[in-house]
Amino acid sequence: MPELPEVETVRRGLLPVLQGAVIESAEARRPDLRWPLPEGFAERLTGRRVEAVGRRAKYLLADLDGGEVLIVHLGMSGSIRIEGAQVKGRPAGFYHPRGEPGTHDHVVFHLAGGATVTFNDPRRFGAMLLVPYDQLDSHPLLSSLGPEPLGNTFHADYLAQACAGRRTNLKAALLDQKVVAGLGNIYVSEALHRAGLSPRRMASTLASASGAPNVRTERLVTAIRDVLREAIQAGGSSLKDHRQVNGELGYFQHNFKVYDREGEPCPTLRCKGHVQRIVQAGRSTFFCATCQR
């Protein structure tokens, strides 16, 4: 499933084409995604101008001039591509034509000026919803989300307070979207390795008895931020389905230190351990038991 860096990469690719554009028409070729498309979906989008393209956690948000917000979730295998766009400052071949419509092209937006934005989702776990702007923050998908890990409200003091007294392991705490929004299996494994913290460690050890942060908390916040920024810069991680809107792959997977590196020597300087794989809550976790404590 795309995590924060992959969704942010898509958002940045959409921004120069979609923001300010008018949707001349919309096609709903397959209305039964993870949830049925909203009633009158295509009609409600036709003629609308996209005022802003944002992101919250793993959700894309397109603010429309009619007072609604289009929420897009890529699901397990969803991707968005742009065709027919000319973007200032981009090489002419940046947005690649794809020819005939794909079997799994479920929603297509035709923009004024000739560009198209297509949502492709082979497994149909993705979703598109229309929500009134003034109800966005209270929507069930968004209302309980924790802070953005790259935002100003995510810091050591917050994380220590969020983890104080929690009777769960550190990995489970970081995957809890109520604690911090947008993290998933890949980037939690990578951040914990950078911070030198075991995924088995109790989350409560990030806080002192008074709930104050400690050196482990500071290291972890820094590691999370650094890993996410580097992954976004690399266009995300393409393991199976993720592609940027121009069809190109992300390449952060080439920079993984532990994720999907089972049996390989730990890359930490002077560490003689090897990367292990364990299963936590049904998900694979990769870490080095020698240097992650």
Curated annotation (Swiss-Prot):
Catalytic activity, reaction form: Hydrolysis of DNA containing ring-opened 7-methylguanine residues, releasing 2,6-diamino-4-hydroxy-5-(N-methyl)formamidopyrimidine; 2'-deoxyribonucleotide-(2'-deoxyribose 5'-phosphate)-2'-deoxyribonucleotide-DNA = a 3'-end 2'-deoxyribonucleotide-(2,3-dehydro-2,3-deoxyribose 5'-phosphate)-DNA + a 5'-end 5'-phospho-2'-deoxyribonucleoside-DNA + H(+)
Gene Ontology MF terms in the entry: 8-oxo-7,8-dihydroguanine DNA N-glycosylase activity; class I DNA-(apurinic or apyrimidinic site) endonuclease activity; damaged DNA binding; zinc ion binding
CDD domains the record matches: EcFpg-like_N (cd08966)
Cofactors named for this entry: Zn(2+)
UniProt EC number: 3.2.2.23, 4.2.99.18
Zinc finger (FPG-type): 257-293
GO aspect biological process, one term: base-excision repair
Cofactor note: Binds 1 zinc ion per subunit.
One Pfam family, short name: zf-FPG_IleRS
Signal peptide: none
Coiled coil region boundaries: none
Superkingdom of origin: Bacteria
SMART domains xref list: Fapy_DNA_glyco, H2TH
Residues binding DNA, per UniProt: H104, R123, R166
Keywords: DNA damage, DNA repair, DNA-binding, Glycosidase, Hydrolase, Lyase, Metal-binding, Multifunctional enzyme, Zinc, Zinc-finger
Active site: P2 (schiff-base intermediate with dna), E3 (proton donor), K58 (proton donor), R283 (proton donor)
Role noted for this protein: Involved in base excision repair of DNA damaged by oxidation or by mutagenic agents. Acts as a DNA glycosylase that recognizes and removes damaged bases. Has a preference for oxidized purines, such as 7,8-dihydro-8-oxoguanine (8-oxoG). Has AP (apurinic/apyrimidinic) lyase activity and introduces nicks in the DNA strand. Cleaves the DNA backbone by beta-delta elimination to generate a single-strand break at the site of the removed base with both 3'- and 5'-phosphates.
Assembly: Monomer.
Cited PANTHER family: FORMAMIDOPYRIMIDINE-DNA GLYCOSYLASE (PTHR22993:SF9)
Assigned protein family: Belongs to the FPG family.
Name of the protein in its database record: Formamidopyrimidine-DNA glycosylase
